[in-house]
Structure formats: structure tokens, C-alpha cells
Amino acid sequence: MKLPDKVMNCIVVFNKDKDKVLFCKRKKEPFKDRLNFVGGKVEPGETSEDAAYRELQEETGISRRQIRLYTLMDLTYYHEDFMLEIYAGRLNEDVVLKEEYNPLLWLQLDEDYTDRERFAGEQNIAHIINIALMYPLPPLHETVG
């Protein structure tokens, strides 16, 4: 089966203490007015990793020097002809967020991320956060060990 041509990404951003996760409130469909991870499209000729850092910078003001992103997983939606690549990382410092388009907010880890009225992704967000929490996700200046 052929892989989809359209590739999107989403980025799970934890604060430096790894007790909060960053969300944006979507202003357009799909999932208008629901909370989701930041992310966007991988442009032609761009690597997936570069696209993740670019989208993070554009949507939040968070730069490569403030976070190390790790590839977490990908989901392929064959019937919708796109692949979603999921990255996760933990900030190495407190940051001042810069909203590009969608409002941004930090949420505690004990939120009900399965609430379909509040969160995008048909309950995928809860699963993604649980997977991300299984890994140490050391900040930029720490080594994996």
C-alpha cells in the first residue's frame, strides 16, 4: 500500500518540570474550538524534523535552543490520505509563549484528555500523552542515559 503524500505533524510540549503540557485552541475545522497539540504541514523538500521545529517556532515562539524534540510515533490515515507524525519534548527553561493564530495554554497532566467536547482527536490525545510520559524526554542540555 502506498504511503500518503500529505504529511502533518503534532508536537507534545512538556514544561521543564514535565507536569504540564501545551495546547492550542483550534480556530478552524476539523475540531474547531477544541484543544489540540500544536503542529502543521510538512512542506515539500522539508524534513519531518525540520517541519516540527518550524511549526513549533511559528505557533509558539519556542526555538530549537529551548527544546529537543523526539520522534514519538506516527499514524497513517490511508482513507484520508495523510500521515500524522508525532513528536514530543520537554523544555529546558521557562518560556514566554508567542501566539501566532490559535490561543495557547498549559494544562496539568491530570486533565480528562478523553473528553471529546473539549479535546480534538477522538481520544487520541490521552493515548499520545500516556505514551510520551513513558519516555524520559531529557531536555536539550541533558544526555540520554
Regions found by a protein language model. Give the residues of each.
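A short beta-turn/loop motif at secondary-structure boundaries
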Residues: 3, 29, 75-79
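A short coil-to-beta-strand element that immediately follows conserved catalytic motifs
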Residues: 63-72
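Active-site-adjacent beta-strand/loop module that shapes the phosphate/pyrophosphate-binding cleft
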Residues: 73-112, 121-136
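C-terminal regulatory/oligomerization modules of transcriptional regulators
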Residues: 134-145
